[in-house]
Amino acid sequence: MDDDHKVSNDISLLPDLNFDSSSPFTSIEFDSSICDLLNLETGGDTPNLIPDHNPFFDSFDGLQEEEEDSHFVVEPESPKVYIAPRVMINHQDSFSLDSRNDEYIEDVKILPGSPGGIQDLGLSRLKVPGSPRAFVHPRSSGSPRFVSPTSPVLIDTAAPFESVKEAVSKFGGITDWKAHKIQTIERRKTVDQELEKIQEDMPDYKKQAVVAEEAKHQVVMELERTRNVVEELKLELEKAEKEEQQAKQDSDLAKLRVEEMEQGIAGEVSVAAKSQLEVAKARHLSAVSELGTIREEIEMVSNEYESLLTEKDLAAKKAEDSVLKAKDVEKQMEGLTMEVIATKQLLELAHATHLEAQEKKLDAAMARDQDVYNQEKELKMVEDEIKRFRQDIDAADDVKTKLKTASALQQDLRAEIAAYKDSNMGKRNNSDIQAAVDSARKELEEVISNIEKANSEVKTLKIIVGSLQSELAREKHDLSETRQRNREDTREEKCTEIAKKLQEASREAEEAKSLAIAAREELRKAKEESDEAKTGLSAVERQLMESKKEMEASRASEKLALAAIKALQETEYANKIEDISSSPKSIIISVEEYYELSKQAHEVEEAANRKLAEIVSKIEVAKEEESRILENLEEVSRETAIRKVELKEAMTKVEKARDGKVGMDHELRKWRSDNGNRSPEGGNKENLSKSKSALHQPTTFTFGEQASSSNVTPQASSSNVTPETETKKKKKRFSLLPKVFMFLSRKKSSNK
């Protein structure tokens, strides 16, 4: 299997040998396409794949007659072959200019059957010339060479390749893979460099885009301005065209009138006078229509002015309401600040009390640890003494038993003495008997004194045991008190939690204070905006007054124009009357005077139009300012509403903090009231010191006082106890045991 994946010049032709070893091996025939494929491009001879002398074939020369039974015979009419995978060589460095050196396509057609039995026959491998640097593609699972013998047979009916170039061109052509790989790497590098350049240029392009947007915006604004200017110029052009037409009409009429006057035509016959009258009538009608439109516009402006006045009054009322609300909010904020200050002071007091409680807790813990250590030490000593006392009691019991035995022996001795007296009355002397009796009496007295001493020692030991039992009871009581102190420590931990809650409440109060400060700033801003709105309203009022004055001036100019029109009408009426009467008293106006009058009327009309336009523009500006002021007032009202909501939230937070503070104060008072009668530093220590001091007196040691001191009830007073008295009482507690030792040593010395 390893040879199949290596670069090799050899391809083994493995015929199907899946038959019995006794079957004859007759011949191997190849299709003509194999020979054609193995030819060189120049048409060289077919290479001899089978050597001339092969011992393998020599051994089977006698079996060539049985060609019908052979499995290796391939008929030329219908050759059934397996197509081995083609190996295409494409290394440019192995090519040369000589066309004969082109690579072979190693296409071997294998006879039907599985390549399995070649090892049994020992067939030598057939070699096909190939390139020394051939690259064999890995075989796929679908290759016909790996198909089982039972699979359907594939028949190659395609025409053979005439040359290697044809085969290569059929399968994609010749390419330089090394150069192609280098080109792809270079392309990738160039693409990466271009990407890096693009990424580096991205911010510059973004800046350019922003600048272009700004320039576009400016150009759009300039376009709008130019449009407005163009519209204004169009209006001015229309006015100029109208004036030019009127001037042309006037000049034509003046020329006609001059010609008629030169010709001597006058009165009704003059065409110029008629046309002049018609023009004057048309102008009069246009002026009347313009006056009507101007009146309508003035009425609209006056209505808008009245609406602006009403809106101004409403805005002023809203501003006053906002100012009042701001003042109320300021008052509320002052109250909140006072409450926040008070809560801060209370929190500081609570923090101080918490610190004091922690200090007391630490002192109590230290004292408790010291007491526990001392009590354990004393308990060990007392246990040792109890063991000794028990040994002494056992010794006393032994003495009692010995005394009983001695009394029994005494009775026996007395009986023996009496018997001896009765028996040996006459034998012994009275002096010897008396001496024996005296010695026996002395022994009895010594035994009796020893018994009395033992009894007294037993009594003293019983008393000491009772005192020690009372001491143990007191120690148990002290242990219970220490447990109670531990419980109080848990309470103190609860107090620390309460202090933490107080700190959280103080933090919330500070947050509420900051919110209140922010609300104050917002109110100040609202006041400033309301002041600005007031100044804007005053400016609008001034502009409205100016517009009123301008309207009055326009009305005056309108009156002047009406008076001029009336004068023109009167002159026209007079001319008509003169024409009708044709009297020589008719007034003839010169052309210059007529031009002057018409010019004055035109100027008056233009002035009225200009004033009306100015009034309209000022009214529009006033409307815009009023709308801006109203928008500002609406924003102020919205902000005040938001600040009100924030103030309500701050008030709720402050109320919650106040409730928490009150609850914490209540819990602190309860804890103080619970721990005031039995503080860990005062009452318990005083009880212990009194119980310890009652065990001894500085001069004598009496068990009656010891017994009476065990029944004394301590009085707790945390204020009267000082550390000096506590240390003295601790020192007095150790004076009991040495006196007991002294008493016992005296007894032992007296016994000796």
From Swiss-Prot:
Tagged with keyword Coiled coil: yes
Keyword Phosphoprotein listed: yes
InterPro entries: Web
Entry keywords, A to Z: Coiled coil, Phosphoprotein
Coiled-coil segments: 186-557, 596-651
Extent of Polar residues compositional bias: 690-723
Entries under Pfam families matching the protein: WEMBL
Family from the record: Belongs to the WEB family.
Identification of the protein by name: Protein WEAK CHLOROPLAST MOVEMENT UNDER BLUE LIGHT-like 2
Species whose genome carries this gene: Arabidopsis thaliana (Mouse-ear cress)
